[in-house]
Amino acid sequence: MNIFLKSAGKQEGTSCVSNMVQLGDFFYISGQTGLGESIQEQTITAINKVIDVLSNYGLQLHHVVKFTVYLKNIEDKEAFLNTFKNFVDEPFPACTIVEVSNLADNATVCIDGLGVNTLRHEEQMQQSSCSHDCSSCGGGCH
């Protein structure tokens, strides 16, 4: 039996695969496939699926430290990266891009990831550094 602190629903079309699991501060996102005709459209939809999964935990893309990208055609790498760069900021995450012979649902791109949920630490740092009347930090300080 797997012991996860949290899991984010089942992956569409499956009965036994979670979209994301978290154990401790670490999380793992199952592959999210793209939709659309072009590699750009597929990249955007795949990333938006990743963003949706992350939002179930209150997380954002900057919490992902490593992506693995599966491309049906490695010649799409440059077009993928030109689209992907619009979603990530410095410091950029690690990323491995590999070519595969086939993907589910005739997708040309699939993206999975792993990361660290730092929300608890961010909140603690905010509370410990508060030196005002707490109006700007939501009243979470004591």
Name the predicted role of every residue range.
Residues 1-62, 71-142:
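N-terminal presequence-like segments and the immediate start of the first folded domain
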